[in-house]
């Protein structure tokens, strides 16, 4: 596949039943779990650090997933890690961050370097999660920069596996 590219001798790896649209590009040190989907015009670029994506994740149209390279400012760099049952909404940007399991990243969100999103979180559309910020499990976050808005309902918590499937 021309849209799956080896970089520095490392070729992306995909679990069973994972689908990548022909217009999406996956480059380098990327490992995706089973039953994932990567939708049109998405870029997943593991060029200077690793990207790990769990099972049953949906990476929607136009999203950009990238790492943070090592530098004097950040000697180790930051990988990009996604847990299981994660939905990344249309045109989201995830950069060198860690996303737990059962998370909805809303459309147009930006999650920056070193941020950590715990399990069972909803990040509202257009939200900015600044560098190094930690989002506590069980809450909705909104705004730029993000703020904790309210606790998630039990119904919302059951919705994660549906949206990612």
Q: Where are the predicted features?
A:
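Thr-Gly-centered strand-to-loop micro-motif
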Residues: 21, 46-47
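Glycine-rich hexapeptide-repeat left-handed beta-helix
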Residues: 1-14, 41, 47-84, 90-165
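Extended, small-residue-rich solenoid/repeat segments and analogous flexible loops
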Residues: 1-35
């Amino acid at each position: 596949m021309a849209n799956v590219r080896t970089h520095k001798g490392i070729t992306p790896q995909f679990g069973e039943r994972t689908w990548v649209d022909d217009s999406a590009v996956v480059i380098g040190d990327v490992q995706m779990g089973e039953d994932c989907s990567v939708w049109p015009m998405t870029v997943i670029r593991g060029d200077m650090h690793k990207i790990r994506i769990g099972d049953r994740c949906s990476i929607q149209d136009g999203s950009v997933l990238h790492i943070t390279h090592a530098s004097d400012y950040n000697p180790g760099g930051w990988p990009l890690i996604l847990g299981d049952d994660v939905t990344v909404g249309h045109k989201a940007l995830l950069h060198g961050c860690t996303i737990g399991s059962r998370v909805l990243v809303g459309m147009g969100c930006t999650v920056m370097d070193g941020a950590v999103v715990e399990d069972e979180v909803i990040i509202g559309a257009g939200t900015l999660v600044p560098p190094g910020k930690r989002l506590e499990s069980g809450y909705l976050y909104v705004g730029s920069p993000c703020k904790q808005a309210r606790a998630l309902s039990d119904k919302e918590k059951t919705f994660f596996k549906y949206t990612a499937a």
